[in-house]
Amino acid sequence: YIKDERRIADSTRAALQALKQQGIITAIATGRSPSVLPEVIKQLMADTGMEMLVSINGQFVRYRGEPLATFPLGSEEVAETGRQMTALDIAYACVSDSKIYVSHETDALKAAMGNLGIAYTLGLPAAGESVYQMLAFYPPERDAEVETVLPASLKPIRWHDYGVDFLAAEGSKARGIQAALNQLGLTMQEAMAFGDGLNDREMMQAVGFAVVMENGHPELKALADHICPPVTEDGIYQGLKTLGVIEA
């Protein structure tokens, strides 16, 4: 997904179709919830016959339209985190599989959410509605202040100058992928992943073969088995071709 242009490279579509024809299961692992996937991603999944979505950083996995593995946060840790963010006057959000609920709007929230074109709902989720991840909106200079009050059961992962994910300490895309593969009778050693951001770190450490984009985060590139061009230069297609997974 080329975020700045909000489009999918034609070569990526062709690569995924080639994998499908070989009987290889393809999936998207994303920090987004299913409800805020860009339309071009939904269309890509439909066009290429992609049946698995590892969403919300691995906390909600759907296969063939049905939940395959889910890891909701505890209601008390959600409530406590909300109380702490309110005390610090920091806007926060609760992510369900269908909506993103925000406590209130701030310039920081608008900057982070607007950058990705993510829709949200003002207000908090109804009692009993599962929350899979939380978000908070503050600059890096407040990191230490927030981390001192964040429940130990959660970990912060920054994805924007003003946006941070609060994820279960043991949660990651890797956990979601592992749970999905277990259900399908496959192992992590049989999996290959492409990534570029810090929320891909555990995934890259866990899969059998890790491919990182050339423009990816330096910490992630250090974990790569192979580095391919960025998506703007047909990176996924070129990487699969170079590795001999698909033919030219």
Task: Spell out what each predicted region is.
Residues Y1-E5:
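Asp-based phosphoryl-transfer active-site loop
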